[in-house]
């Protein structure tokens, strides 16, 4: 039987003392057999090149968290620094309620930076402050995926001595190359990037390190908990979140291992869920936060990435390559990246803007084509794929940032959308937003201020200046690749971002999808199993795992739309834009097409929630701990 070591939070509340006390006992739990990706024509994947220590199965989840609690159903407990917690009783099951000063939803760069800054202020001011971070992934960093050429500006401010504290930031960017690709050639262009002082990193590894720093300062971090609902008080103020119940079968009945979720409350709640956060989007709509500042709709891209181990002779640590052009058509914005990491590893990815028009376009297959370009193939040949993943990213920039403050908290990081598109960087801005929100939250709790100071300080920060200067880059490409390059070059090199106007985005991504009759189907080559691979093989490398016997977290608002609209009018685009083959059309008993949702394949990329032409798919959280288990991304 496979086994893994449960990592438990170094928390300081009596409620979690039982968890902490097990740290020295090396608690071992069984690892459930990993589920193979499911399709109607599923194939057996090859052996994973990752060693067993990189495989994660059933997480240390709500079952473990509650079963270790010493409380009886009628007890009240004293949380961190005097914050009370209580259990709420029903006739069916016990549902706990825990309270903190600050609750952070999501253990990514923004959420962990906020937690660290809060604890720093707590120590500086000698004021007790309880901070909790909940994370839907089985471990901190397990759902984190990014390029990533890291700009350390925010980290320098947050943890000035990180260079002496063994941060996983080791490979300085050594060179920048910018290529325009045709089918067979790569033309060098002047590089608009300046990565001097930046580092080629794995963001999932950096986030793990940040999680450790947050815990050292006293933050309670609970992975394996999916935040499924927002909690409000009688005045419609946000007071926390509810985690998803565990142990519910596909038909909605309670299984023998059923455990109710937990109500986790905060005097201030910060949402740091990443791009297209499910609860963040509800908050934005409920409080009309875009309308508050006349922000435009958000626009997105889908990033697909692999980490390869290549021959030593081809490895140039710190080399950074970006491309435009092939394999994408001139009307589709996007490009690829290839970053040389440490240990003979390279990060290769393709980013495709989700406002593409052709419903036959398949981002996953475009990525497979990319690897056969002579300039890319020459680097990869003889290498081995170590990991695969995908995630959407915000590309709306300055124009699309909503008012980030609501009654009871704020939205931070990529949930709000602080990516600098021409830089292809958002980690440093996400971290800074978390730090600014933390300072506002501390001021609101202990200095008589309010959370609006987050918005004020954000607009006075380098984040705002940086995004304002880059605001016209992405919408310039609404006019096509060449006009976009011309406009962005003029603004970048000549006008230095000081143009007197702001371009608007075009249609929302789902509205940009054309009817299938306007396009010719694209015939993609079959994978060769050496450079290009089928979806089940790639999924195996993502370590994705969900309990099959749970309700689908991918909900159809109208179950008839796939067969009556998407299939006949748009040629089933969900079967192509999803990089995990979650959506698959099969024949029913009468030989008619029927949508089958393979929810267990889901990489949590959120493309379906964004790109579905009729906005019929709603992405919600599955049981805590499900999804990918990235370790290199």
From Swiss-Prot:
It catalyses: a ubiquinone + reduced [electron-transfer flavoprotein] = a ubiquinol + oxidized [electron-transfer flavoprotein] + H(+). It is found in: Mitochondrion inner membrane. Its EC number is 1.5.5.1. Disulfide bonds: none annotated. FAD binds at residues 102-116. One of its GO terms (molecular function) is metal ion binding. A ubiquinone binds at residues 334-335. [4Fe-4S] cluster binds at residues 578, 602, 605, 608. Its cofactor is [4Fe-4S] cluster; FAD. Disruption phenotype: Accelerated senescence and short siliques with reduced seed number. Residues 593-622 form the 4Fe-4S ferredoxin-type domain. InterPro entries: ETF-QO (IPR040156), ETF-QO/FixC_UQ-bd (IPR049398), ETF-QO/FixX_C (IPR007859), FAD/NAD-bd_sf (IPR036188). Up-regulated by KIN10, by S1-bZIP specific dimers, and also by C/S1 bZIP heterodimers. Keywords: 4Fe-4S, Electron transport, FAD, Flavoprotein, Iron, Iron-sulfur, Membrane, Metal-binding, Mitochondrion, Mitochondrion inner membrane, Oxidoreductase, Transit peptide, Transport, Ubiquinone. Induction: By dark-induced senescence. One of its GO terms (cellular component) is mitochondrial inner membrane. Residues 1-90 form a transit peptide. Belongs to the ETF-QO/FixC family. Accepts electrons from ETF and reduces ubiquinone. May act downstream of IVD and D2HGDH in the degradation of phytol or chlorophyll during dark-induced senescence and sugar starvation. This is Electron transfer flavoprotein-ubiquinone oxidoreductase, mitochondrial. It comes from Arabidopsis thaliana. The gene is ETFQO.
């Amino acid at each position: 039987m496979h086994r893994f070591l449960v990592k438990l939070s170094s928390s300081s509340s009596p409620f979690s003392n039982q968890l902490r006390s097990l740290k020295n006992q090396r608690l071992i739990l069984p690892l459930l057999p990993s589920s193979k990706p499911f399709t109607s024509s599923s194939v057996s994947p090859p052996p994973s090149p990752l060693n067993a220590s990189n495989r994660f199965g059933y997480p240390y989840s709500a079952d473990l968290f509650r079963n270790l609690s010493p409380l009886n159903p009628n007890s009240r407990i004293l949380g961190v620094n005097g914050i009370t917690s209580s259990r709420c009783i029903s006739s069916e099951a016990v549902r706990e309620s825990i309270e903190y000063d600050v609750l952070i939803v999501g253990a990514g760069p923004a959420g962990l930076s906020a937690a660290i800054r809060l604890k720093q202020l707590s120590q500086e001011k000698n004021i007790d402050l309880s901070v909790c971070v909940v994370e839907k992934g089985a471990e901190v960093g397990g759902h984190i995926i990014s390029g990533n050429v890291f700009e350390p500006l925010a980290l320098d401010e947050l943890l000035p001595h990180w260079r002496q504290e063994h941060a996983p930031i080791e490979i300085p960017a050594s060179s920048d190359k910018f290529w325009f690709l045709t089918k067979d050639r790569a033309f060098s262009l002047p590089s608009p990037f300046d990565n001097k002082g930046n580092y080629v990193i794995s963001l999932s590894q950096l986030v793990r390190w940040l999680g450790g720093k947050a815990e050292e300062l006293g933050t309670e971090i609970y992975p394996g908990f999916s935040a499924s609902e927002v909690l409000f008080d009688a005045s419609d103020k946000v007071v926390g979140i509810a985690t998803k119940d565990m142990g519910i079968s596909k038909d909605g009945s309670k299984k023998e291992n059923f455990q109710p979720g937990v109500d986790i409350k905060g005097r201030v709640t910060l949402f740091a869920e990443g791009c297209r956060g499910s609860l963040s989007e509800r908050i934005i709509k409920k409080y009309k936060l875009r309308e508050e500042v006349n922000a435009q709709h958000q626009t997105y891209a889908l990033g697909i990435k692999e980490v390869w181990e290549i021959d030593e002779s081809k490895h140039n640590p710190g080399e950074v390559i970006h491309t435009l052009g092939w394999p994408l058509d001139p009307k589709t914005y996007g490009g690829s990246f290839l970053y040389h990491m440490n240990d003979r590893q390279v990060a290769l990815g393709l980013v495709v803007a989700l406002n593409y028009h052709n419903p036959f376009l398949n981002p996953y297959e475009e990525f497979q084509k990319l690897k056969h370009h002579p300039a890319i193939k020459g680097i990869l040949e003889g290498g081995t794929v170590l990991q695969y993943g995908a995630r959407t990213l915000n590309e709306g920039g300055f124009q699309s940032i909503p008012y980030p403050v609501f009654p009871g908290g704020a939205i931070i990081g990529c949930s709000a959308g602080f990516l600098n598109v021409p830089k292809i960087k958002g980690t440093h801005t996400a971290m800074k937003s978390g730090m600014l929100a933390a300072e506002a939250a501390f001021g609101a709790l202990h200095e008589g201020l309010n959370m609006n100071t987050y918005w004020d300080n954000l607009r006075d920060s380098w984040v705002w200046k940086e995004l304002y200067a880059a605001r016209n880059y992405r919408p310039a490409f609404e006019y096509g690749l060449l006009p976009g390059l011309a406009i962005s070059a003029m603004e970048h090199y000549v006008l230095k971002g000081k143009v007197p106007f702001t371009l608007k985005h075009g249609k929302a991504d789902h509205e940009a999808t054309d009817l299938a009759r306007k396009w010719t189907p694209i015939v993609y080559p079959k994978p060769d199993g050496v450079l290009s691979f089928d979806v089940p093989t790639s999924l195996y490398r993502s370590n994705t795992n969900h309990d099959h016997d749970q309700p689908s977290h991918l909900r159809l608002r109208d179950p008839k739309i796939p067969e009556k609209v998407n299939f006949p009018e748009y040629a089933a685009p969900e079967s192509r834009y999803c990089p995990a083959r979650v959506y698959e059309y099969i024949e029913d008993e009468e030989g008619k097409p029927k949508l089958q949702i393979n929810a267990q394949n889901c990489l949590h990329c959120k493309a379906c929630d964004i790109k579905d032409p009729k906005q019929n798919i709603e992405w919600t959280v599955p049981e805590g701990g499900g999804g990918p288990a990235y370790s290199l991304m």
